[in-house]
Amino acid sequence: MKPIKTLPLLLLLLGIIVGTFAGCATSASHGAPDSITSLEDFKNAKLGVVTGSVYDGHSKALFPNAKLAYYQTFADLFQCVQQGKIDGFMADEANFNAVKRVGADLSALKVPDLCVEVGYGFQKNARGEALKAEMDAFLATLRSDGTVDRLIEKWYGSAEPTQTLEKPDFSDNPTPISIAIDSSRKPFVYMLNGSYAGFEAEILYMFCEAYGYRPSFSGVPFASGLAGLASGRFDVVVGGLYVTDERAQSVHFSEPHTYADVVMVSHNAEEASASFFANFKENFEKTFILEGRWKQICKGIGTTMLISAASMVFGSLLGFLLYLLSKNSYKCISSTAKAIGKVYARIVAGTPIVVILMILFYVVFAKYKNVGSTVIAIVAFSFSFGSFVYRHMGVSVGSVEFGQTEAAYALGYSKTKAFFKIVLPQAMTVFLPSFCSEVVSLIKATAIVGYIAVSDLTKVGDIIRSNTFEAFFPLISTALIYFLLTWIVASLFNILKRKLEPKRRSEDVILKGVER
């Protein structure tokens, strides 16, 4: 059977296996009673906490014997508690009510004498202080004219907003402003019909329009947003940011726009659906059809392939150029290139690509806000891919017998012509298989670019997951799409390899241009 015919069977088999295990998933208690009726039931429970959130300290203080598990976003917590991975977690009541509106199987118990203040975060410098003063004045105006009350009813009320937030045209505004948004923080800010929406998002749009700012938005978790704020990459952080004395030492906070009670969220087994398959159609529609989310997925695929293709091209040029310089006739040039190549290859081999990515984003290009996240991702992966090309070009060219070069010289070829006409074509048959594997690895590795606010395929899947609070379809569809992309790329390279194999080429093709 040909490999191409096995693809549908593999996809079908994968879907059946994953669907079966997902359908068999059940909630499990980790020290808490099956039915939670009071806060006392959480004393020996497994509790979820968002890394760096204020609830870390509160959870430890209220439940010292509980086991804590740390997650990236509140959306992760809502999903994990429904799947039984944790028994509960702390959240603000506004966030809980917004998630509950979409039909999540959750219940909540209010934590006595505990509330949180939510505001906007700005840089701890003169510009940040000026922005804070403007935002405070703007919020005071919105409170006095009743706009805040109207927005509270709109975004915090019992009805789920369905209308896309109208975004003003900021293109003519003179002053740029870089904004980090954690879009997993419904109802403060989240994605609705492919655009940012929510209480904070609407106020932010009005603020930029009133003060003449031209915003650029970057979707990142709040912890990454705070890091970018400290490095100067962002001017504002938005996403249900809690105001605390500790954070105020490094962040200018606006006056709180929301005061919310804190609740302990747990899974409500009585409201749980009968089975996975009973909600299969509904979950499919929420993931792909509702709000045209399939369009977001297509854009994510395009971004992933753009980064992969550009990194492959620029990385190949970088690695090949460095290899040519290392073989230069002038010893000073070749020695320098070899030394650079050795250090370069060692740095890439010993440093995780995600660290390189974040260094470029938060340190090297922190002050260059006009350099987009996608460009930075291409630079990082080109840097990494170039190291592979440099190392493997040496191995591949070294596999060609030196007698081939001597024969070319005997025929009157120059050193350059002998390399490009005789040696390199033979080296390609050794180079291409590993090159193909590295390109496939490159495509999969780009899944981390969401760390620097690039809306690639994985990031889009996370955004959809944070809106639907369903993990199955966003994650499985992302995995299948990566599988298809890498399979297609590998198939194309296999075709190219077959065309370059001497045994498969006719005599006329091999001797083309040779006088007989």
Feature map (PLM): residue ranges:
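Extracytoplasmic small-molecule ligand-binding "clamshell" domains
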Residues: G31, N44-T51, A61-C80, N173-L241, ...
